[in-house]
UniProtKB/Swiss-Prot annotation:
Protein name: 5-formaminoimidazole-4-carboxamide-1-(beta)-D-ribofuranosyl 5'-monophosphate synthetase
Domain ATP-grasp positions: 81-328
Enzyme Commission number: 6.3.4.23
Pfam families cross-referenced by the UniProt entry: DUF1246, DUF1297
Organism of this sequence: Pyrococcus abyssi (strain GE5 / Orsay)
Lineage: Archaea, Methanobacteriati, Methanobacteriota, Thermococci, Thermococcales
Annotated binding of 5-amino-1-(5-phospho-beta-D-ribosyl)imidazole-4-carboxamide, by residue: 14, 74, 235
Length: 337
C-alpha cells in the first residue's frame, strides 16, 4: 500500500509563519499560497514554506500536493465564506462553524447558548442610551469599528465610517454595549481526538488609533475632534492572574459544548474575545473560531503550553500535531471537512 504524503498549507498572511513553522517541527512539508510580493517572506527571510503557490486559492495544485488547508482570519476574509464552504481541499476544522462566526446574530445565539456573560446588543440605534461599539460582520481586524455615545452620534459616524444612511442598511452591523474593562483574548485548542480543551496562550491587541490617542492631551483631542478607531496593528503577550484562569477555561468548555449542539462541534484553535471588568467578570463580545494572530508572540510556546508539554508548543504546532496523530490513528477524515 502506497503511503500518501500529506502537506500542510495556509494562506500567506495572518499567522502563516507560525503555522508553517509548527508544521515543519512536526515533520510535515509545507505550502504557502498568496501574492507574488510576499513570497520572499516565507521562502527567503523566514524559510518556512517548502512550496509557494502564487494565487488567491490554487485549488488544483493544492489537491495535487495532498494539502490540508489551515484556515486563518485572512484566509476567510480574502476568499469569503461561500468559497471556503465549496472548496475541495481538506480543511482542518468544521466548515459549518464559519457561518456562525461570520454572522454576528448567529454568533450571539452561540455565545448565549454557552451561557457566557455578554454585552447588551441594540437592534434599534435610536434606543442607544449608553456608549456602544459598532462592528461590521466578519473578520476584518477591527476595521470599521467605532464608538458612539447616543443615536445622533451613531448616525453621524455610521455614515462617515461605513457609508450607511438608513436602518435598512444596518443588517450587516452589530451595535454592542461598550463594556469598560481590560481586554483579554484567551487562545484555546480543542482536540477532537482526545476530547480535551487546552488553554494555549493569552494576548491583548495593539490597535490604531485607540492605543496611541492617550499620548495626545485631552484638550487637544477635543480640539482635533479625533475619532477612536480599532484597527489591529499587533499583539502583546499576557499572563492572566492565576485566580482568573478557571473563568476563561470554563468559558471555553461551555463554548465547545454549545457548538456540539448547534453545529456539530468546534475543534482546533479558537479565541474568545472579551474584557475583565473591575468586578472581575469575564464579558465576551465575540468569538474567532480559528487560529488568531494573537498566538503569534508564542511561536516558541507560552507559559501555559510549557506547563502542559514541557517543550516548545505554539498553536500552529499543536494544529500540526493533531493532524499527525490523526494520520497515525487513521482518523484524518475526522478532523477535516
Amino acid at each position: 500500500m502506497v503511503k500518501i504524503v500529506v502537506r500542510i498549507a495556509t494562506y500567506a498572511s495572518h499567522s502563516a509563519l507560525q503555522i508553517l513553522k509548527g508544521a515543519k517541527d512536526e515533520g510535515f512539508e509545507t505550502i504557502a499560497f498568496g501574492s507574488e510580493r510576499v513570497k520572499p517572506l516565507y521562502t527567503k527571510y523566514f524559510p518556512v514554506a517548502d512550496y509557494f503557490l502564487v494565487g488567491k486559492y490554487p485549488e488544483d495544485e493544492l489537491l495535487e500536493l495532498n494539502a490540508v488547508v489551515i484556515p486563518t482570519g485572512s484566509f476567510v476574509a480574502h476568499l469569503g465564506v461561500e468559497l471556503v464552504e465549496r472548496m475541495k481541499v481538506p480543511y482542518f476544522g468544521n466548515k459549518r462553524v464559519l457561518k456562525w462566526e461570520s454572522d454576528r446574530n448567529l454568533e450571539r445565539k452561540w455565545l448565549e447558548k454557552a451561557k457566557l456573560k455578554l454585552p447588551r446588543v441594540y437592534d434599534d440605534p435610536d434606543d442607544i442610551d449608553r456608549p456602544v461599539i459598532v462592528k461590521p460582520h466578519g473578520a476584518k481586524g477591527g476595521r470599521g469599528y467605532f464608538i458612539a455615545k447616543d443615536p445622533q452620534d451613531f448616525w453621524t459616524k455610521v455614515e462617515k465610517f461605513l457609508g450607511i444612511k438608513d436602518k435598512e442598511d444596518l443588517k450587516n452591523v452589530q451595535i454592542q454595549e461598550y463594556v469598560i474593562g481590560v481586554p483579554v483574548y484567551p487562545h484555546y485548542f480543542y482536540s477532537k481526538l482526545t476530547r480535551e480543551l487546552e488553554l494555549m496562550s493569552i494576548d491583548r491587541r495593539y490597535e490604531s488609533n485607540v492605543d496611541a490617542i492617550g499620548r495626545i492631551p485631552s484638550k487637544d483631542q477635543l480640539e482635533l475632534e479625533l475619532d477612536i478607531t480599532y484597527t489591529v496593528i499587533g499583539n502583546i503577550p499576557l499572563v492572566l492572574r492565576e485566580s482568573l484562569l478557571m473563568d476563561v477555561i470554563e468559558a471555553g468548555e461551555r463554548t465547545v459544548k454549545a457548538a456540539e449542539e448547534l453545529m456539530g462541534g468546534l475543534w482546533g484553535p479558537f479565541c474568545l474575545e472579551g474584557v475583565f471588568t473591575p468586578d472581575l467578570d469575564f464579558v465576551v463580545f465575540e468569538i474567532s473560531a480559528r487560529i488568531v494572530a494573537g498566538t503569534n508572540p508564542f511561536i516558541n510556546g507560552s507559559p501555559y503550553t510549557w506547563l502542559k508539554y514541557d517543550e516548545p508548543m505554539s498553536t500552529g504546532r499543536r494544529i500540526a500535531r493533531e493532524i499527525r496523530l490523526a494520520i497515525e490513528e487513521d482518523k484524518l477524515d475526522e478532523v477535516v471537512s
